[in-house]
Amino acid sequence: MINDVISPEFDENGRAMRRIRSFVRRQGRLTKGQQHALDNYWPVMGVEYQAEPVDITALFGRDAPTVLEIGFGMGASLVTMAGHNPQQNFLGIEVHSPGVGACLADATEAELSNLRVMCHDAVEVLENMIPDGSLDMVQLFFPDPWHKARHNKRRIVQTPFVELVRRKLKVGGVFHMATDWQPYAEHMLEVMNGISGYRNLSSDNDYVPRPDSRPLTKFELRGQRLGHGVWDLMFERKE
């Protein structure tokens, strides 16, 4: 497993260039189980980053609808979705290796063959590896809201990013976002409404009820008991 989650970029003078990232990589300690999964299951389900388009049909060994999830955390929801939808391919991206290890362990225990995982910056993966018009759905669940105003520029949902996602979706493909931070939900809606190539699937042109396709997490259930809200947004590529 190659553990460089970002690729260095240099200017014409050879100086390293800084790109605003939507994540801070806090490298937590791996449990023995997570390390075992990385050592043994990454060769089966792991996908190394490459700066050229990947053949998705070859990657999964079949031609099937493909779902990309960005930032899957510990992977519980992703594994559940892959298990419930064996007719679909699932590609998950996460920059924190403990989460990748946990996901690999759970996916192996569930005997999943339709799941692949990556440990790299999702923006670079989308820019360089994912062919245009190849994805049926892109999922972005509970991304870091970067609460402080001075950090808002770090939010992954910005106009260039959602335009990039649109290019990677098939016509009719869906970009599904969810957040438990209302100001971020409002920001997401504002950004999406500014892009002409999407159609909001909400009948009220704002948020949709949580679809059955997105499993409830323990964190979300706890939040519901405390009266916390969750906002789902689903936008379809229309052109």
Curated annotation (Swiss-Prot):
The active site is at residue 144. Residues 150-155 are annotated as: Interaction with RNA. It catalyses: guanosine(46) in tRNA + S-adenosyl-L-methionine = N(7)-methylguanosine(46) in tRNA + S-adenosyl-L-homocysteine. SUPFAM superfamilies: S-adenosyl-L-methionine-dependent methyltransferases. The keyword Methyltransferase applies. Keywords: Methyltransferase, S-adenosyl-L-methionine, Transferase, tRNA processing. GO terms for molecular function: tRNA (guanine(46)-N7)-methyltransferase activity. Substrate binds at residues 148, 180, 217-220. The keyword S-adenosyl-L-methionine applies. S-adenosyl-L-methionine binds at residues 69, 94, 121, 144. GO terms for cellular component: tRNA methyltransferase complex. Pathway: tRNA modification; N(7)-methylguanine-tRNA biosynthesis. Its EC number is 2.1.1.33. NCBIfam families: tRNA (guanosine(46)-N7)-methyltransferase TrmB. Monomer. Catalyzes the formation of N(7)-methylguanine at position 46 (m7G46) in tRNA. Belongs to the class I-like SAM-binding methyltransferase superfamily. TrmB family. This is tRNA (guanine-N(7)-)-methyltransferase. The gene is trmB.
